Amino acid sequence: MNNLEQKNNTPPLLSRNFLIIGWVVVIGLLTLVAGRWEERQINPNQQLVSQVSAEGKSEVVLQRNRYGHYVTSGLINGQEVTLLLDTGATYVSVPENMAEGLGLRKMARSQSSTANGVVDTYLTRIEYLSIGDLEFYDIAASINPGMNHDTSILLGMSVLKNIEFTQRGDQLTLRLAP
């Protein structure tokens, strides 16, 4: 067999490389799309739009996620965070591994009763927290070492006590309480 016949029987290297690169790009794009779709299932409120009510109050409308929870994007001390509304939490509860990056310092040791029992926590203060145009200052919070696997911050009653809620279907409207 001569060299010419051998070349014709071998798939062109360039075509094979383009095929491999094409499949890598397709798989990468599918992974990216699937990841964003999953994020939207967990937090359908990533792009909040504030509106003004008939009474002239600023309000934010949240869509319930597929698990039945209200999860939203917000800001703590200027940093973007994911918040899970939790009327059973006394304070805003921040995972310990996120606290330093949010500018929170551990103050007094404390304990909190959770669904998993009593846990050691640290009290702290959040200078600024916002959900859309709803803004809150000097908020009582806790730093929870037991939440380090969580990617959401529990938005507890130390903020929620300042909000009026109206739920209709899968939507929860938040506005500042008078």
Predicted regions and their residues:
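Pepsin/retropepsin-fold aspartyl endopeptidases
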Residues: M1-T82, T87-P178
